[in-house]
Amino acid sequence: METRALSVNLREVKKNGAAKLRQQGMVPAVVYHKGEETVAISVDEIALDKLVHSAESHLIDLQYPDGKSVRAFIKDLQFDPVTDRVIHADFKRFTADEVVEMEVPIHVEGEAVGVKIGGGKLQINMHTLTLKGKPANMPEHFTIDVSALETGHSLHISDLQATVPAGTIEIIGDADAAIVSVAAPRKEAEAEAEEETTEEA
């Protein structure tokens, strides 16, 4: 996974301080690590937005004015419900040998045979996956090829986990959860529903 640099400044936690920072185009944030004191920082809103809205996940090199830097990743974000701007960020610091949990985006490629030939509709049920492992093993995204997916079939978390080299990363979540599915054409689905109703009667 690629590492991106992000300049940060230390900040004082005081009344109305966060609001003033936002007016200056800065986002209040914190950096934390188990067993250590949480550090209050601020980051440039535009620079943070580029990371947040990237199609890839990244490890981040937080760079302080005194030349110090720490490795971290975005653990949590708070958004303004009206403007959708990032109003607060949590960064989790890590060490190279530490096992962490990170969200990475899902990239879907290919045209499902159930859509191309069967006339079905591709349903994407998840847009990110939560992965557990060492930072060096984390991918920037997870690519799913749906070309062979037929009507009425799904790709589950367990299917993806089977493609991951043993001992590298673990996909967190219900193994039976469907990531993508191909739904039957509407008329076919309605016919099946009517058939089930008739059988029940």
Swiss-Prot record:
Keywords: Ribonucleoprotein, Ribosomal protein, RNA-binding, rRNA-binding. InterPro entries: Rbsml_bL25/Gln-tRNA_synth_N, Ribosomal_bL25/Gln-tRNA_synth, Ribosomal_bL25_b-dom, Ribosomal_bL25_C, Ribosomal_bL25_long, Ribosomal_L25_dom, Ribosomal_uL5_bac-type. GO terms for molecular function: 5S rRNA binding; structural constituent of ribosome. Belongs to the bacterial ribosomal protein bL25 family. CTC subfamily. This is one of the proteins that binds to the 5S RNA in the ribosome where it forms part of the central protuberance. Part of the 50S ribosomal subunit; part of the 5S rRNA/L5/L18/L25 subcomplex. Contacts the 5S rRNA. Binds to the 5S rRNA independently of L5 and L18. This is Large ribosomal subunit protein bL25. It comes from Chlorobaculum parvum (strain DSM 263 / NCIMB 8327).
